[in-house]
């Protein structure tokens, strides 16, 4: 199967490298030519607890994203795994807009919300799947270290509005099977919206606070003052979800604390962005919570304050 990986960061290389090692043809698409050349020159090594996978330079197909459209028209891929951050979605849509009349199968791995509606408007004939994953990885120049074994769940975007056709279901199960064969715990879910809102809640609490205090995830729960602010953010989301008819598990607070424990040494993606001076996904995470509240004539004051605080931490000119 030909699989396109857009975004050659830690997760993109983890998924792409393992899919390549299990027999798929994988094409990596990077932001710049220099990034593609570096990947093609160095190859990549994937480090796991019990093995290392060495992807040699001559096995790597890497090109800048600007060449994706022409390449895809000549040799269509069967699936495209979109692994860029929310802040790069508009650039991706710009690059792929010439394919708006084609049918692409796209699995979207983004945090936060808002990107799927944008993509559906830009690519109305394509199949969009949400991918919710607890996989984590860290990258050095040519090495990716997998942070334990997570779960990946796939589901069609807006399945509660438009049911999947048999062909769409078959395509989604094919991708799930390929990911399983590559060593990922992947299943197809009919409750993907619930999983998305669960992850949004967790990210809206953990990400901004770790970025603000510059601490790993586990440090959030070692002081009662921090847990009180976590609970305030959590309660605001639950009120908004309840008004929106979104139901989560009764033990959601315990699940949130458990995530902090199980990822205790992890640096959240938002903290990593702040430390390196990159734009964050706060508008798509806490900003989305604020927008949900506004549509319901409710307020999310703590989320709104954190939204402005994190945006204010970004360097001038970075969005």
Residue spans of the language-model regions?
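NAD(P)+-binding Rossmann beta1-loop-alpha1 motif at the extreme N-terminus of oxidoreductases
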Residues: 1-55
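Helix-loop-beta segment of a Rossmann-like dinucleotide-binding subdomain
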Residues: 143-159, 214-220, 266-276
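Active-site-proximal catalytic alpha-helix in oxidoreductases
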Residues: 193-221, 225-238, 265
